[in-house]
C-alpha cells in the first residue's frame, strides 16, 4: 500500500470516516494517481464509493476537505451482480480498500486482480475502445459531410485518442488524463505503433504546443468556465429537473472546486514543461464539459442540438455571446481548419482505426499470452 503524505492522509481519513457512517455506503477505495504512486502535489484524490441504493448510473461529485480536492465516484452495488462493466477494471485493480462493510468490494477487487492482465479481460476492455473510436469517427465523417470542418477535426482527433487506449491496455499501462501522452507514446513504441501516436499528435495539433500556447489554453479554459457557469447558475431549476446523467455531470463540471482543480493541475504540468500534456488535459476536460453544457443550452433555448456538429451547434446556441464559440475553437485548436486538410485527417483517423481493429487480437495474443 502506498504511504500517503500527511496533508493528504489526514483530510482523506476524515472523509472516509464521514462517508462510512452513511447507511447507503458499503465500500470505499482509493484509486488513481495517489493509489498508483505517480501523483503530483496538485493531483486530485479519486475515491470509489460503493452504494447500495439503486442509482441509475455511475456518477462523480467533487468535494473539498481541508483544501484537498476529492472526486467521489459513486457506483451502485447492482453492477457487481452481473458481468462487471469494463470501465471499472482500472479503478478496482488500483483500489486500496479503505472501508468495506460486507467484503463485497474486497472480493470483487481480488477477482479483478486475478483477471486484469489476462488476454480475455484485455480483449473485453479493448473492444470497448474500438466501439468508442468508431462512434467518434462516425461523428467526424458526419460533420465533414455536413460542412462542419471544426467538429470534423475535433472528432477525428478524439477517435484517434480512443484507439490509442488499445496499446495502453495491451501493455497494461494506466489510462490517466494527466499522463495520457507520456503513457500512450511508451505503449505505442513498445508495440511498434509509433506512427499511430504521431498521427494522433499531428491531428490534435499537440505536436506544436509550447509554453505560451499551453498557458493561453489555461486562460481560455478559466474564461469559458466563467461564462458557462453563469448560464448554469441562472438556470439552476432546469439543472435540477434534468435527466440523471445530465444533472450529475452539470453539477460536477460547474462546481467551482472542479475548475480550481483543473487550473492547478494544468499549471503544474506547464511548470513541469510538459506542455502538450497540459494542452491535452485541458482540451479533453473541456470537451466533456462542453457536451454537457450544450445539452443545457439547447434545453433553455428550446433548440435541438446535433452532437455530430457540436461546434456549429454551439455557434448557433451562442449567437448572443459569440465569444463562447470563438474561445472554444481556440482552446480546442480549431482556429485554422481547411476542408482539404480536414478530409485527409478524417481519412487518416479511419486508416488507423481499421488497422488497430484488425491487429488488436494479434497484439493481445503476442504480448499477453505468456502472462
Where are these regions (language model features)?
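Conserved nucleotidyltransferase catalytic core and NTase-mimicking acidic/glycine-rich helix/loop elements
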Residues: 123-371
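A short alpha-helix capping/helix-coil boundary motif
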Residues: 15-16, 39, 118-120, 159
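Short N-terminal helix-initiation segments at or just after the protein's N-terminus
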Residues: 9-16, 98-105, 223-229
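Generic hydrophobic, helix-prone segments enriched in Leu/Val/Ile
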Residues: 9, 103-112, 225, 349, ...
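Short, functional N-terminal and low-complexity linear motifs
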Residues: 15-16, 78, 101-107, 150, ...
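Metal-dependent nucleotidyltransferase catalytic core
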Residues: 1-26, 31-43, 48-98
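Internal, well-ordered alpha/beta segment that forms a basic, Gly-enriched binding/recognition surface
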Residues: 86, 90-139
Amino acid at each position: 500500500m502506498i504511504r500517503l503524505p500527511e496533508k493528504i492522509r489526514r483530510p482523506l481519513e476524515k472523509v472516509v470516516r464521514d462517508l462510512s457512517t452513511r447507511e447507503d455506503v458499503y465500500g470505499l477505495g482509493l484509486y488513481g494517481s495517489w493509489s498508483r504512486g505517480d501523483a503530483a502535489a496538485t493531483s486530485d484524490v479519486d475515491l470509489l464509493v460503493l452504494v447500495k441504493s439503486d442509482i441509475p448510473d455511475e456518477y462523480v461529485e467533487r468535494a473539498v476537505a481541508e483544501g484537498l480536492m476529492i472526486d467521489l465516484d459513486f457506483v451502485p452495488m447492482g453492477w457487481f451482480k452481473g458481468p462487471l462493466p469494463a470501465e471499472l477494471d482500472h479503478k478496482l485493480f488500483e483500489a486500496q480498500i479503505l472501508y468495506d462493510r460486507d467484503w463485497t468490494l474486497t472480493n470483487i477487487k481480488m477477482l479483478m486482480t486475478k483477471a486484469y492482465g489476462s488476454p480475455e479481460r484485455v480483449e473485453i476492455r479493448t473492444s470497448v475502445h474500438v466501439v468508442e473510436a468508431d462512434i467518434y469517427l462516425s461523428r467526424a465523417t458526419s460533420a465533414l459531410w455536413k460542412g462542419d470542418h471544426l467538429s470534423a477535426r475535433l472528432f477525428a482527433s478524439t477517435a484517434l485518442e480512443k484507439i490509442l487506449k488499445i496499446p495502453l491496455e495491451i501493455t497494461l499501462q494506466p489510462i490517466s488524463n494527466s499522463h495520457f501522452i507520456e503513457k500512450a507514446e511508451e505503449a505505442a513504441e513498445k508495440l511498434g505503433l509509433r506512427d499511430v501516436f504521431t498521427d494522433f499528435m499531428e491531428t490534435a495539433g499537440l505536436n506544436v504546443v509550447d509554453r505560451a500556447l499551453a498557458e493561453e489554453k489555461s486562460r481560455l479554459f478559466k474564461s469559458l468556465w466563467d461564462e458557462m457557469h453563469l448560464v448554469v447558475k441562472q438556470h439552476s431549476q432546469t439543472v435540477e429537473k434534468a435527466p440523471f446523467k445530465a444533472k450529475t455531470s452539470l453539477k460536477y463540471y460547474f462546481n467551482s472546486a472542479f475548475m480550481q482543480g483543473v487550473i492547478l493541475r494544468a499549471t503544474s504540468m506547464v511548470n513541469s514543461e510538459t506542455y502538450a500534456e497540459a494542452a491535452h488535459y485541458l482540451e479533453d476536460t473541456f470537451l466533456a464539459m462542453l457536451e454537457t453544457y450544450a445539452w443545457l443550452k439547447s434545453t433553455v433555448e428550446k433548440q435541438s442540438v446535433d452532437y455530430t456538429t457540436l461546434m456549429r451547434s454551439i455557434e448557433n446556441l451562442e449567437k448572443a455571446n459569440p465569444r463562447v464559440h470563438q474561445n472554444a475553437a481556440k482552446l480546442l485548436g480549431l482556429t485554422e481548419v481547411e476542408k482539404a486538410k480536414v478530409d485527409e485527417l478524417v481519412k487518416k483517423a479511419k486508416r488507423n482505426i481499421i488497422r488497430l481493429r484488425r491487429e488488436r487480437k494479434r497484439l493481445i495474443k503476442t504480448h499477453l499470452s505468456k502472462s
